[in-house]
Amino acid sequence: MTLHINRRRVLAAAAAGTFAMLEARLAVAQTLTRVRLTAGANIGYSHQYVGESAGIFRKHGIDASVILFDVGFLGTEAVVAGQAETAGTVEFPLMSLLARGADLVVPAIMITADDLKIVALTSIAKPTDLAGKRVAFIFGSSAHYAFYRYCLRHGIAWDQIKAVNVPAAEQVAVMARGDVDAYVWLEPMVQRGLDVMRGRAHVLRPGIETAYRTRTYLEMSRTWVERNQEATVALLRALIECDAFVRAEPRKTAEIAAKKLNIPADTAADLLRRTAFDWRIYLDAEAKKVFADVAVWMRENGRLTGATPDIDRVFVPQYLRQIDPSRVIGF
């Protein structure tokens, strides 16, 4: 009798323990906020890949998944459509969506870099050699506006450029076929183009960095942020920790990015070394002037016909200020 009672007690205790574990897991799951982050399929979003893979987002209460797009602004369109919670793009595509009525906010700048490069035939030795040449880039992307600024900086009239709209994944192929003389994009397409062209192409110097520096803005739906203010702060805390991880664990970061992008780990490590990405999370009011310049260019080129979006309303510094006021400059 005693033996049977003990068995029953053991089984009951085991069952109770199992239920307790399930309840604990359920409680954890219920406290997590689902966040679908988007990223351009390139090495520049490595901090997000780290947050997903190393459990940093989950640590801060975020049930995160990073969705890859060919280019960052497609992620912004997904946010506008309610198919994602975050995106990261530069000024031009963001301004275009704002002008069309997208109600987006920017809690932080999350990537700063000199990552855009001009891959050109070796016969193009200096900026002015681009006049009359066929140059590929993604219309409406960061490369579009950055290359325009580059031409302006180096005295090349825009109507002298034969612009060709080519998706990132096809740029190397169209150059190899001889359909274009140069293209403007970032890694890993820069190195891939150099490898395929086998000495017939180079990275043009001076480069885009003489005219434009990439700032990638964390973009979110205003409605979502206002309904999930604690989660917004938690997401920013997680991104700050992602930056710290990248700085402390460069090799592990390369391995994670390589797996996400389906490239060799050594290639990812090399790209991270050669491209000066800064994943520090901050918000600088200087960005408002950049947006103002973009708006002028858009209007002059027929890309902005209505009222200029109110950029002051777009920036929401209060969430980052809760974490670290020193990261918020000029607001």
Task: Identify what each model region corresponds to.
Residues A29-P167, V172-V174, D181-E187, H202-P206, ...:
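Short, glycine-/small- and polar/acidic-enriched structural segments
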Residues F92-P93, V164, A169-K260:
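Pocket-lining segment of extracytoplasmic ligand-binding domains
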